[in-house]
Each structure stands twice: as structure tokens, then as C-alpha cells.
Swiss-Prot record:
Homodimer. One of its GO terms (biological process) is tRNA N1-guanine methylation. The gene is trmD. It comes from Xanthomonas oryzae pv. oryzae (strain KACC10331 / KXO85). Specifically methylates guanosine-37 in various tRNAs. This is tRNA (guanine-N(1)-)-methyltransferase. It is an enzyme of class 2 (transferase). Keywords: Cytoplasm, Methyltransferase, S-adenosyl-L-methionine, Transferase, tRNA processing. It comes from the Bacteria.
Amino acid sequence: MRIDVISLFPEFIAQCAAFGVVGRAQERGLLELQGWNPREHAQGNYRRVDDRPFGGGPGMVMLIEPLRACLDAVQAADARPAPVIYFSPQGRRLTQMLARELAQLPRMVLLCGRYEGVDERFLAQAVDMEISIGDYVLSGGELGAAVVVDVVTRLQEGVLNDAESAAQDSFEGPQGLLDCPHYSHPSSHAWGDVPEVLRSGNHAAIARWRRQQSLGRTWLRRPDLLDEAGLDKHDRRLLEEFRRELAKGDEESGCTPSP
């Protein structure tokens, strides 16, 4: 996969992408990441990329021409078509489902806004999709771009050493459940013991426990993700057992069962 990032701070993206999974993907030739600075395509001595908004008001707006010239250079660098994605609070919410869609693309262009944003005419003519990574305000789109680069890269075939790592992550699978708890050595510690089932060597029992924990955690922490009506009989039974155990523990501790 190739990802081109248009940003006034392309070095930021390069630094974020130099480590961990994304860094290894580049080393293995599974990801080609290229940063582009629209300032290098601006005209005049000052290479201006922004100006005051029409109608007044605070802040500056990124200009059409430097962005257009930069995008032309991006598109000329690779013949493969690529959607242009802009980061905006008005965009489609980034989810694991959307990440899987993007991961199927051979190439994409990520556009990072700054200041008060980008001239609307450029967005209308050149942008194919707007994405939001959450309902909060950032100083620019670079953090959003770094997030997309990471979530999309780890879904590429051969990037993760263990293919099951991605399949078992939170939000993966047909129900999009949260992940189950994980433990490592030592098995016994002052802060608690590893559940006995995980030390049993019984793979069927371990798989059952993990599925139940995923269902229970999703019900407890992100009920908006859980479609109980869509669960099969096995999953409904596991979830009901989880609830009973939770209620029993709450009663023994004198707490009110939750949620």
C-alpha cells in the first residue's frame, strides 16, 4: 500500500511512522509512506499557503492554489488512482469497519488541514471523503493522519507477525466486540492471580472464557456496540452467565449490580 500525506508538517507524520508496526511495514516494503508540503508548491517569496477568510473572523484559511499544485504533484508521482481524504469533524467517524475498507485500497492521499481549515472550493472539487477521529478539536489533521496510517497498515497482509493478532483485536469479528483481558507471567502476584482457566491447557475452555469476557466487557463498557438481538444462543448463554457471576460478586461485596 502507498499512502501520501499532504501536510504543512510532513516531518511529524514521518516521525510517528518510524516506529513499531508501521516502521516495520516500511522496512519490509509493505507500506510506502510519502509526505508532501504544500508550502513547497506555493508562489512568491514568502510561499504563502493561507490568508484571511472572506466575511471576517479569526484565524486563517488554507489557500486553493498551493494545495492544488501539491495534489497535482502527488497524483503525478504514482499512476494508481487514490481517493483524497480530508480530516474534519464533519466527516465520517473512523471505525474498525471503515479501517478495513480503507485497507483494501492500493493507495490513498491524506490531506491535513490547519488554521481554520481549507478553502471550501478545494474540498468540493478535490476531496473524495472526509473522516473524523472523534468529537473534539485538534490543531490540525496530522494526528488523524497518523491514526489512519497505523490502523490501516496493521491490517495489511504480512505486517503483523501473527495474523490472529488483528483478528482478535477489539472491534474485529462480525459483532465488533471489545477484546478479552490478557495476562502474562507471573501467574501469581500481589495484585492478583491469572484466571485458572488460562493455566489449564484446555483450549476449548480458554476459547469459551475469552468469548464470554469479550461479550461481558462489551456489555459493561460499550453497550452501544452490543446487538443482543443478533447474538446466537451460545453467546446469549455466555453473556447471561457473565451477568449472573457479576451480580453474585457485587452482592458478596455489598455493591449494587451494574450496569
